[in-house]
């Protein structure tokens, strides 16, 4: 059975509507994707750090309750759980304030068992943070040498716009390791001041990675697969309660689609067929739509049970 290994931050998301807190849920970009995959019966594990506090204990318990292996989530004596405040606007899109001590990030883990065509997902500032770069790079190198598929969600927030020059070498290295790159229009506006899929792909991505997914909220998903493949996919119409986990769950769905339809690293190196793209993107859109129906950051347990079938 193929496995999915995620590496990323853990955060407690406190969600506000009309400036009042309405929910507090465990979060983090890769974390959200891994929880959704766990709910869908995928063999999933997570590598991270959690605070040495009640929130950290809750996050580790939450991973395990959702079928995710949390053996590589470390706690350190002086670490505190990071918090993000997510303020939902009238469209139920979120604006964030992060309370996280990035310079004191720590990461210790034993390399998990990785077999050919297992999938490693990583994302966000965590993926480029210089403080933990040696450990993240070590995992990418290990995954590549063992034949894994590497899925990189750029997910670069405007809060870090002043760090772009400093993290660019790590960003480029990530793009080079990746078999698939996904990013949003907001990510690339922050990084490159570019706001069209073709401009981003041709100028910034295609030299490093041929398989590219460009999401833009409620607008169509743009896919570029080398010189030969280009397609737009309309987003599913759904009632939206929160978009906080939309992109993370698109990642989960796309990865679920790769597993379900037997898409391998060799397929990616050759370039996916239109049918393969169609199936995997549709899974991504289904996961994203389900997540947006509620205030939580992941697909519902009911959706997960349906996917297991």
Language model segments and positions:
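Anion (oxyanion) recognition and catalysis
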Residues: 38, 64, 141-145, 175, ...
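Conserved phosphate-binding/catalytic region of the ribokinase-like
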Residues: 2, 195-309
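Conserved beta-alpha-beta core of the PfkB/ribokinase-like small-molecule kinase fold
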Residues: 128-199, 219-220
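Conserved N-terminal subdomain of the carbohydrate kinase-like
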Residues: 43-124, 307-309
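Active-site metal-binding loops of divalent metal-dependent hydrolases
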Residues: 10, 29, 125, 154, ...
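Glycine-rich phosphate/adenosyl-contacting loop at the front of the ribokinase-like
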Residues: 1-69
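Structural alpha-helical scaffold elements that stabilize or flank donor/cofactor-binding regions
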Residues: 113, 171-174, 205
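Short, well-ordered alpha-helix to beta-strand connector turns
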Residues: 116-118, 147, 178, 209
């Amino acid at each position: 059975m193929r496995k999915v290994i995620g590496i990323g931050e853990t955060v407690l998301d406190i969600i506000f509507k009309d400036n009042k807190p309405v929910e507090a849920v465990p979060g983090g970009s890769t974390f959200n994707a891994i929880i959704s995959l766990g709910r869908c019966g995928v063999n999933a594990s997570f590598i991270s750090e959690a605070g040495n506090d009640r929130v950290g204990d809750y996050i580790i318990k939450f991973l395990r309750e959702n079928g995710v292996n949390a053996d590589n989530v470390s706690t350190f004596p002086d670490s505190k759980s990071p918090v993000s405040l997510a303020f939902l606007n009238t469209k139920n899109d979120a604006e964030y304030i992060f309370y996280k001590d990035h310079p004191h990030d720590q990461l210790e883990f034993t390399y998990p068992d990785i077999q050919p065509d297992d999938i490693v997902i990583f994302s966000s500032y965590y993926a480029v943070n210089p403080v933990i770069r040696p450990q993240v790079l070590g995992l990418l190198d290990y995954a590549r040498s063992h034949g894994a598929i590497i899925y990189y969600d750029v997910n670069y927030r405007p809060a870090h716009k002043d760090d772009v020059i400093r993290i660019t070498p790590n960003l480029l290295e990530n793009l080079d390791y990746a078999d698939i790159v996904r990013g949003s229009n907001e990510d690339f506006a922050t990084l490159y001041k570019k706001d069209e899929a073709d401009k981003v792909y041709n100028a910034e991505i295609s030299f490093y990675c041929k398989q590219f997914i460009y999401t833009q909220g409620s607008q169509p998903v743009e896919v570029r697969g080398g010189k030969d493949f280009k397609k737009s996919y309309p987003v599913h119409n759904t009632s939206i309660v929160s978009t906080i986990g939309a992109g993370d769950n698109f990642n989960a769905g796309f990865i679920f689609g790769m597993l379900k339809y037997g898409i391998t690293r060799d397929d990616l190196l050759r370039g996916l067929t239109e049918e393969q793209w169609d199936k995997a993107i549709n899974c991504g859109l289904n996961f994203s739509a389900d997540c947006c129906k509620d205030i939580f950051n992941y697909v519902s347990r009911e959706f997960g049970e349906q996917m297991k079938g």
